[in-house]
């Protein structure tokens, strides 16, 4: 289980997160919804250690990870796919995967079963489409293709929780549905998910529970359908 207890995070002089608390239980899909600038990405970055928390605690499976470096959080079982996908542009898709697969081996994780593509077959089941462009450099991938690679690559380390920052942003509706299918499959593997999302309707399609954030503070927690009945949430999301 992942638990944030009253964390405060700054970006430079700006106080972005103000006492944020949330939990993600085992094999649960939780969505953090809010408009741009509300604090979603900062929350994800705080969990991954990309931004230091000024106060409060982040606990993962009973251990305080608030001061751990990013790579140790990843090795502890926290997977991460950033909003910009984080694909190395000058490397092929296979080479992008090989970096993660080598980290998995170095960490003593179960060795991925690489097929003819050279990529872990387990994660390719999430997005079989990736097989068609494994030799293409990251620079020449579409936005949707980059996101596919980022999510599948994050699964290489066999995380117990996966953090996804705006995975559906900029995708056509039919592609969003395809990504939601992949997220559902990840959850069926027993992996917990924390997803940052700005669209409440999309959030409701993947969330077991939903948190709404505005100006760095949690303003709602509950079932997705309840969010649509909450006047403050609806006003905030619509801007």
PLM regions: where:
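ABC ATPase C-loop
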Residues: 154-155
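The feature captures the beta-strand-to-loop junction immediately N-terminal to the Walker
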Residues: 33-35
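Catalytic Walker B motif of ABC-type/P-loop ATPase nucleotide-binding domains
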Residues: 162-166
